[in-house]
Amino acid sequence: MEQSFLAYLRGRTRQLPQVAVGIGDDAAVIDWPGSVSSDQPQLRQVACTDQILDGVDFRSEEQSLSDIGFKAMAINLSDIAAMGATPSSALVTLALPAENATEIAGEVYEGILEAAQKYQVAIAGGDLSTYDGPLSISITILGWTEQPWLRTGAEEGDALFVTGALGGSLLGRHLRPEPRVELAAKLKQTVNVHAAIDVSDGFSLDLDRMLAASRMGAELELETLPISEAAHQFAEKSGRTPLEHAWSDGEDFELIFCVAPEEAAIIESTDWGVPVTRVGKVVGRTGLWKRVATSKFERVFPQGFVHGETDVAAAN
């Protein structure tokens, strides 16, 4: 439902000149008005928003409210990182259950403020309301960049990378995600990232979205896919393989990105503080393809969480 409705909105909303990147990427990019100074870089505003709802995106009876507040900030920060931007400020809106509203707000804000301090984000404003319903948290984060990373910039031959390790987030990592804000800043200073996206709905599904936006595909070396220890643990109970969890589990909040092949060696030889793994290359034919022999590839299909739907095509 989400992707089809976004397509509908793109057709209905008016694209004004100040909106450089609108609906369809990890965040919007808004150009500042006025002339560009000859001796100052032009900074572009990046804005993203996410809402999480009790009973849908989290369960307040099973998780600490502080963790929920931290996560609400982190998922937005992950979108900012995927744009290659620096976060600056946030607007926080809470819709609170009327019963114990003050206590709930205080505990949620403990996590929000912890994340804000960790990633140097100012809480600039927001709104509070109470009603007879579940807790809802909506956060908008504003950031800036000179040149945003988009989903649309992948080029044939680009080397594909993913940060961190994938899969098994439901065993606990999803409670306190680590958005790759610092890593994105280091990448920005070191290489020219052509396209990027964060892994929120599943590695394969989000990779496919980035490539579709670029009208490209990918040839993947699935044996190189970085699989988390949690994915191995989860596989012991789920009946699925660790690779299947890495392929499709959501809420990893890692970054997928691509660079020109001549810059791949820079990525691989640099200590980024977290693992950054080469997993394949961008190709001109659409779709995802896995290597099965020296020069033979088979089509594989994305799988992950789709808002308003049950699943997408099987991964194999």
From Swiss-Prot:
<feature type="binding site">
    <location>
        <position position="50"/>
    </location>
    <ligand>
        <name>Mg(2+) 1</name>
    </ligand>
</feature>
<feature type="binding site">
    <location>
        <position position="200"/>
    </location>
    <ligand>
        <name>ATP</name>
    </ligand>
</feature>
<feature type="binding site">
    <location>
        <position position="57"/>
    </location>
    <ligand>
        <name>substrate</name>
    </ligand>
</feature>
<feature type="binding site">
    <location>
        <position position="151"/>
    </location>
    <ligand>
        <name>ATP</name>
    </ligand>
</feature>
<comment type="similarity">
    <text>Belongs to the thiamine-monophosphate kinase family.</text>
</comment>
<keyword id="KW-0460">Magnesium</keyword>
<dbReference type="Pfam" id="PF02769">
    <property type="entry name" value="AIRS_C"/>
</dbReference>
<feature type="binding site">
    <location>
        <begin position="126"/>
        <end position="127"/>
    </location>
    <ligand>
        <name>ATP</name>
    </ligand>
</feature>
<feature type="binding site">
    <location>
        <position position="79"/>
    </location>
    <ligand>
        <name>Mg(2+) 2</name>
    </ligand>
</feature>
<feature type="binding site">
    <location>
        <position position="201"/>
    </location>
    <ligand>
        <name>Mg(2+) 5</name>
    </ligand>
</feature>
<protein>
    <recommendedName>
        <fullName>Thiamine-monophosphate kinase</fullName>
        <ecNumber>2.7.4.16</ecNumber>
    </recommendedName>
</protein>
<dbReference type="GO" id="GO:0009228">
    <property type="term" value="P:thiamine biosynthetic process"/>
</dbReference>
<dbReference type="GO" id="GO:0009229">
    <property type="term" value="P:thiamine diphosphate biosynthetic process"/>
</dbReference>
<feature type="binding site">
    <location>
        <position position="79"/>
    </location>
    <ligand>
        <name>Mg(2+) 4</name>
    </ligand>
</feature>
<feature type="binding site">
    <location>
        <position position="198"/>
    </location>
    <ligand>
        <name>Mg(2+) 3</name>
    </ligand>
</feature>
<feature type="binding site">
    <location>
        <position position="127"/>
    </location>
    <ligand>
        <name>Mg(2+) 1</name>
    </ligand>
</feature>
<feature type="binding site">
    <location>
        <position position="26"/>
    </location>
    <ligand>
        <name>Mg(2+) 4</name>
    </ligand>
</feature>
<dbReference type="GO" id="GO:0009030">
    <property type="term" value="F:thiamine-phosphate kinase activity"/>
</dbReference>
<keyword id="KW-0067">ATP-binding</keyword>
<dbReference type="InterPro" id="IPR016188">
    <property type="entry name" value="PurM-like_N"/>
</dbReference>
<feature type="binding site">
    <location>
        <position position="79"/>
    </location>
    <ligand>
        <name>Mg(2+) 3</name>
    </ligand>
</feature>
<feature type="binding site">
    <location>
        <position position="251"/>
    </location>
    <ligand>
        <name>substrate</name>
    </ligand>
</feature>
<dbReference type="InterPro" id="IPR006283">
    <property type="entry name" value="ThiL-like"/>
</dbReference>
<keyword id="KW-0418">Kinase</keyword>
<dbReference type="GO" id="GO:0000287">
    <property type="term" value="F:magnesium ion binding"/>
</dbReference>
<keyword id="KW-0784">Thiamine biosynthesis</keyword>
<keyword id="KW-0479">Metal-binding</keyword>
<feature type="binding site">
    <location>
        <position position="49"/>
    </location>
    <ligand>
        <name>Mg(2+) 1</name>
    </ligand>
</feature>
<comment type="function">
    <text>Catalyzes the ATP-dependent phosphorylation of thiamine-monophosphate (TMP) to form thiamine-pyrophosphate (TPP), the active form of vitamin B1.</text>
</comment>
<feature type="binding site">
    <location>
        <position position="305"/>
    </location>
    <ligand>
        <name>substrate</name>
    </ligand>
</feature>
<feature type="binding site">
    <location>
        <position position="50"/>
    </location>
    <ligand>
        <name>Mg(2+) 2</name>
    </ligand>
</feature>
<feature type="binding site">
    <location>
        <position position="26"/>
    </location>
    <ligand>
        <name>Mg(2+) 3</name>
    </ligand>
</feature>
<keyword id="KW-0547">Nucleotide-binding</keyword>
<feature type="binding site">
    <location>
        <position position="109"/>
    </location>
    <ligand>
        <name>ATP</name>
    </ligand>
</feature>
<dbReference type="GO" id="GO:0005524">
    <property type="term" value="F:ATP binding"/>
</dbReference>
<dbReference type="InterPro" id="IPR010918">
    <property type="entry name" value="PurM-like_C_dom"/>
</dbReference>
<comment type="pathway">
    <text>Cofactor biosynthesis; thiamine diphosphate biosynthesis; thiamine diphosphate from thiamine phosphate: step 1/1.</text>
</comment>
<dbReference type="Pfam" id="PF00586">
    <property type="entry name" value="AIRS"/>
</dbReference>
<dbReference type="InterPro" id="IPR036676">
    <property type="entry name" value="PurM-like_C_sf"/>
</dbReference>
<dbReference type="InterPro" id="IPR036921">
    <property type="entry name" value="PurM-like_N_sf"/>
</dbReference>
<keyword id="KW-0808">Transferase</keyword>
